[in-house]
Design a protein with these regions (language model features):
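Aromatic (phenylalanine/tyrosine) cluster motif
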Residues: 362, 367, 372-374, 393, ...
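Short, intrinsically disordered C-terminal tails of secreted or membrane-associated proteins
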Residues: 411-415
Length: 416
């Protein structure tokens, strides 16, 4: 799985390439479309995660079986409103398959296999899962930034969680056809609903920046023992690791061959493949010709990207160092000047505060002995204290008796 936000972003990009009818159906049933885009992964968060592994073909199952059952259900549906809703879910489901098939070989080439038999012990399994979460969370951050979206404002899953019309029809539609496709004698609808609730809840929690920073600090203090918990948190204040952004090729984790491909190329290919998949689904719903659909949508394992393989076949990956996947903090304040404002402006009336906000900017001068960024006052000694208070990091150097470096700085300001 690339994570949920990546799947929704790609679903929207793929939507632009669809037929007018498909665009209308998905536009009128956005909640169903987005639910379909993340449905493959929902079971991973619940009590039966192997149901998700099965959907991805990880156990050797045909990844198209559920698709065909759902499309036959859509063909038999007589209610136009429900049919459009179900079609939208299927189209989102197809987009997920296309994105996973395209991106997962690269993801696993960096994260390594999570299957116990491919690892010497549980510690290595957990490391692979940690790397996997880091990679997919970074992909979310990358595509959000590329689209100019923010975690604070981009909330596609509110509608998924709150749309009563969709939740009354789609979960049972999906689960009943899942049961038919794989011959499961169990009502999976409550399992799916509970799993998706957890999925959406974790998605919200991992967007909490203060909590993420606190956990990262604790993880560093504990030598990485919180890796699994920390790796899923979004890092809005950090830059995406070069190993995930600037690559030009990667070693396929199953075949071992060198795949010449970049992040931009993977993005382009995922959108193109999703367009083909949904066009094939739309055609099948209209004419019911199975052979044409199976030719357009091969039985690719969604983890390996290779036909007729299992998750355990990932044996040739070259995992990256976890430390290289954490990203470096963006030191934006070192590239921008501070705004100087009068002493006490933080507690002043609105007029003075506005005046302070409109004050001119001054460049930062890192002080050699302390490395502390200091904005020199525009005039003599009287502006030293306000400028220091304005910086907000340490007390004014004039009153830092135990800081000779700052006393020296103060003296220099006096002489100037």
């Amino acid at each position: 799985m690339p994570r949920d936000l990546t799947h929704v972003i790609f679903a929207e990009d793929i939507r632009k390439n669809l037929s007018a009818e498909a665009q209308r159906d998905t536009g009128e049933n956005t909640a169903a479309f987005h639910m379909g885009a993340i449905a493959h992964d929902a079971f991973l968060y619940g009590s039966q995660p192997k149901l998700a592994t099965k959907l991805h073909g990880g156990l050797g199952d045909d990844t198209r079986a559920v698709m065909i059952e759902m499309m036959d259900d859509v063909r038999a549906e007589k209610d136009p409103e429900k049919q459009a809703m179900k079609k939208s879910f299927v189209y989102g489901f197809m987009s997920h398959a296309a994105v996973d098939t395209t991106f997962h070989p690269f993801v696993y080439s960096v994260s390594g296999s999570q299957v116990p038999e491919n690892n010497p012990d549980q510690k290595h399994v957990d490391l692979a899962k940690t790397r996997h979460r880091y990679i997919e969370t970074w992909l979310d951050v990358h595509f959000l930034r590329e689209k100019g979206l923010s975690l604070d404002t981009f909330k596609p899953f509110k509608q998924v969680a709150n749309d009563k019309r969709t939740n009354a029809v789609v979960p049972s539609f999906f689960c009943e056809n899942y049961e038919k496709a794989y011959g499961i004698d169990q009502d999976l609808t409550p399992v799916f609903k509970n799993s998706m609730k957890i999925q959406l809840f974790i998605g919200r929690v991992t967007q909490n920046q203060p909590l993420g920073k606190a956990l990262r600090a604790l993880d560093n203090a504990l030598d990485g023992r919180l890796g699994l918990a920390v790796s899923g948190f979004y890092q809005a204040d950090r830059a995406m690791p070069p190993v995930l952004k600037d690559f030009e090729s990667y070693k396929h984790p199953v075949t071992g061959r060198n795949v010449v491909q970049s992040l931009r190329g993977l993005t382009r290919d995922a959108v193109a493949l999703g367009t083909v998949y949904i066009a094939a689904a739309e055609k099948y719903i209209k004419d019911g010709v199975t052979k044409a659909f199976l030719k357009a949508v091969p039985n690719c394992n969604l983890d390996t990207g290779v036909e007729n393989t299992k998750l355990a076949d990932i044996k040739l990956a070259t995992p990256a160092d976890v430390e290289k996947l954490k990203g470096e903090k963006i030191k934006a304040f070192m590239r921008k000047g501070f705004k100087a404002f009068p002493c006490g402006a933080r507690n002043a009336d609105p007029a003075r505060r506005k005046q302070a906000d409109n004050a001119p900017e001054f460049p930062l001068i890192p002080f050699k002995r302390t490395g502390f960024p200091y904005a020199p006052p525009p005039t003599g000694l009287r502006r030293v204290q306000p400028a220091c208070e304005r910086a907000g990091y340490r007390p004014c150097p004039r009153f830092s008796a135990k800081r000779p470096a700052f006393r020296h700085l103060c003296a220099r300001a006096v002489s100037e």
